Structure formats: C-alpha cells, structure tokens
C-alpha cells in the first residue's frame, strides 16, 4: 500500500522547509509512521546536528531523517537523507515500507547523500561526514580562498633545456640496443633451425616407413612364393584359371549368339534362387524318382566330357548358369540305369557316356586335377586371401584363410559357393585363390 503524506501534509512541509532554510536554527527533522498505518507524521526536530539526531532514532520503528550539515571541504551546506529501519522491525513491515523509500525521497528533495541504515554503526557522525566529504568532489575551502592579487615579484629567467651529450652513456645505450637486436636475431635463427630439423626428422621417418613397407612387401611376396613352391608346381592353377576364363567367355558367347545381353552375376544368382524355390516335384513313373540335382549333373553335352571336365553349360533360354560340377570317373558311370530321371520339362535321361578319348598331355593334367576334386567331395575349392563382408543376403562373408567349397564360376569377376558358415552365395573372385 502507498505511503500517505496528505493527512499530516502541512506539518510535514513545515518541518522540511525549516531544515532547508539556511538561516533557520533547525538543522534536522525526523519522520515516522502513525502506529501500523502508512500515514507519515513528524517525530521531532532539533538544532543539535547529527549527534542529537542519532539519539532520537528508535530501533523498533521505520523512520526517515533529513539533516543539514556543513561540507568539511568547501564549508557549504549539504543535506543528508537517512532511511532508518530498526533491527526490531518485523520482516512483513520491512517489506511494506521498502516501497515507500522512493516516495519519501521525492518529498524530501535536495539530498546530497542518502544513507540506508539498520544499526547505530551506520549513522555515526564521523562516517556520515566522511561520505559527505567524498560526495562534494572538491578539496578546497570556499571561505578561505582570497580574491586579492598578490605580487610575488619578478620571476627568474627560464633555464635552457639543453643537456650535454655524455659519450659514455650514449655508447652504453647504443650497445644495449645492439645487444637486444642481436638476441632477437639469434632467437629467430634458432627457431628457423628447429623448424628445419623438424622437417628433416619428418622426412627421415617417412623414408624409414617406406623402406619398412617395401621390406614387408618383399617378405610377403617371398612367403607367398615359398608356399606355392611347397604346394607344388603352379601349372595346374594357371591352367585352371585359363579354363575359368574359357568357361566365362563361352557363357557370354552363348548369350550373344542367342541375341541377349549377358546378365550381371547378381541377377543370375537371384534368378536361379527363384527358379529353385518355385520348382516342385512332379509326378514320376513307378519305381523312378525325378531329381533336379541329377538334371544339373547328367544333362551335360557328351562332347564336354572329352574337352572340358570342369566346364559349366550356360543355358540362355532358362536365364541362369548351370553349376560347375566335377566330372564323374568312368568307373563310377558303368553302373546300371539310375533310378532318377530329370523333370518333365527336360526329358533327357542320363545315359552312360561314350568312352572318353585319350586326351593330350595338357588335358591329362586337367583330368587328374578334376578327379582329385571329385575324390574330395567338395567340388571346386578356394582359400580366402582377404576378408570380405556380404553386402546383402545373396553374398557370403569370409575371413582370410577360410575355405570356400562348391564354387561355381558364373562370371569373370564374381563366383559363388559355400562359405565357412554353410551359406551359399556370391563373392568376388579376386579375393580368393584356388586350391590345387
């Protein structure tokens, strides 16, 4: 609630005017509240200065004091406003009266120093006069200054500012300047030398790193050569690579002769998976079974047995490449008629192939190599040189030194086979090497 100055307005104004009047003997006035209301009344006035005013302050009330003092520096009158909040006042009253400070300051205008006091130590006359002296901003006595002119007599002639040069001190100063210039130059040279040495050290470390890499590459190459020499002559692997290239090129030629563009290996694999998933077992004759597995093994052209034991037959019309299956030894093919026959869409039954003609010296090695693969029962196998992570579910993952079995050469850059986890999928051909 706002403070009320109108109820006792004439008495308040009269006390204030008596203090601000310079010729009036009254030099202080004290104001307080009427009971617990917000009405301001005059608590007292006096002529005894700050010492008398301090004695009238009550520690259980909120009071406002306005006092006239003399500036100790200039001797001019100064006015001091004291906002007194006693230590015995409750917190609720303190909060309510805190909003009245600005209103009382507007009413008691002209104060040079405002002091917010809570204890007697805050209103000691010495402390108040010290604050008044600091607030004046001038260290002179207005009444002590004399306005009369005083003749102090003739002034002495002004001396010259010339100073004789001291050679010794000049030499020392110049020498000192040269010393610091030399020190700065040496410091700059030292930084350049450190930078040059750091560059040389960096180049030396780079050269050592290159040499270590070359030596490690040479040792890896040497170990690779030793492994190949210990495994046997490299001719079968080279001939196997030639056979793989021939298989891939023949597959592409068959696609081109059929007027179609060779599909990507990934598309071939997906089409083959779809074809195998949609193939169902059809009705068969009594005493015979139909097997897609025997279809893939026994429908090879007869000419392929004598020429390329590992050559897969590409079927452009079906849209997929047949698996690369090792040829069966002639002794195993002289049994009775098999109890399996191919599905109805391919009615060609397995028949005993004609006797294999005697191949040349080069093809003999290939036959021996493929027969060794047949005996292993794993098909075409390879060892991983690097690690590879599958990009999707149509590929397989493997680590270095893992074995990949049942490999089918479906493209020059992509093969497919069974990974170490048994999953069948594609993988890059340059990540593996065939096992001789």
Curated annotation (Swiss-Prot):
Annotated disulfide bonds: none
Record's subunit section: Interacts with FGD1, MAP4K1 and PRAM1. Interacts with ANKRD54. Interacts with WASL and WIPF1. Interacts with SHANK2 and SHANK3. Interacts with both COBL and PACSIN1. Interacts with DNM1 and SYN1.
Tissue expression notes: Detected in brain (at protein level). Widely expressed in brain with highest levels in hippocampus and cerebral cortex. Located primarily in dendrites and, in moderate amounts, in cell bodies. Isoform 1 and isoform 3 are the predominant isoforms in brain.
Family as reported in the entry's similarity comment: Belongs to the ABP1 family.
Any single Gene Ontology cellular-component annotation: ruffle
Source organism of the structure: Rattus norvegicus (Rat)
Record-given protein name: Drebrin-like protein
Phosphoserine: modified positions: 160, 277, 280, 283, 291, 311
């Amino acid at each position: 609630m706002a403070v009320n100055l109108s109820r006792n307005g004439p008495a308040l104004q009269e006390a204030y005017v008596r203090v601000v009047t310079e010729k009036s003997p009254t030099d202080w006035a004290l104001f307080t509240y009427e009971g617990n209301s917000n009405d301001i009344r005059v608590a007292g006035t006096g002529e005894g200065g700050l010492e008398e005013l301090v004695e009238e302050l009550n520690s259980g009330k909120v009071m406002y004091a306005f006092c006239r003092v003399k500036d100790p520096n200039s001797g001019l009158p100064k006015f001091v406003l004291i906002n007194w909040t006693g230590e015995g006042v409750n917190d609720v009253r303190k909060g309510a009266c805190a909003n009245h400070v600005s209103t009382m300051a507007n009413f008691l205008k002209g104060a040079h120093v405002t002091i917010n006091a809570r204890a007697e130590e805050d209103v000691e006359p010495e402390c108040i006069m010290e604050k008044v002296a600091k607030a004046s901003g001038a260290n002179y006595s207005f009444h002590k200054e004399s306005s009369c002119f005083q003749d102090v007599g003739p002034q002495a002639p002004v001396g010259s500012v010339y100073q004789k040069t001291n050679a010794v001190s000049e030499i020392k100063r110049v020498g000192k300047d040269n010393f610091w210039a030399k020190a700065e130059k040496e410091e700059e040279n030292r930084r350049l030398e450190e930078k040059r040495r750091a560059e040389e050290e960096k180049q030396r470390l780079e050269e050592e790193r290159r040499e270590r890499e070359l030596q490690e590459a040479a040792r890896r190459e040497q170990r690779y050569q030793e492994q190949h020499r210990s495994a046997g002559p490299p001719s079968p692997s080279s001939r196997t690579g030639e056979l793989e290239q021939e298989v891939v090129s023949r597959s592409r030629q068959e696609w081109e002769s059929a007027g179609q563009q060779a599909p990507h290996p990934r598309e071939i694999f997906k089409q083959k998976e779809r074809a195998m998933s949609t193939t169902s077992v059809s009705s068969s004759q009594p005493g015979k079974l139909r097997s897609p597995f025997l279809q893939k093994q026994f429908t090879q052209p007869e000419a392929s047995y004598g020429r390329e034991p590992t050559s897969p037959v590409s079927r452009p019309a079906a849209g997929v490449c047949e698996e690369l299956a090792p040829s069966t030894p002639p002794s195993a093919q002289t049994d009775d008629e098999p109890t399996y026959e191919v599905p109805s869409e391919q009615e060609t039954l397995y028949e005993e192939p004609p006797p294999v003609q005697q191949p040349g010296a080069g093809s003999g090695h290939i036959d021996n190599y493929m027969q060794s693969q047949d005996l292993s029962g794993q098909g075409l196998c390879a060892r991983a040189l690097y690690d590879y992570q599958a990009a999707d579910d149509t590929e397989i993952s493997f680590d270095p030194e893992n074995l990949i079995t049942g490999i089918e050469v479906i493209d020059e850059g992509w093969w497919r086979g069974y990974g170490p986890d048994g999953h069948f999928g594609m993988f890059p051909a340059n990540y593996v090497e065939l096992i001789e």
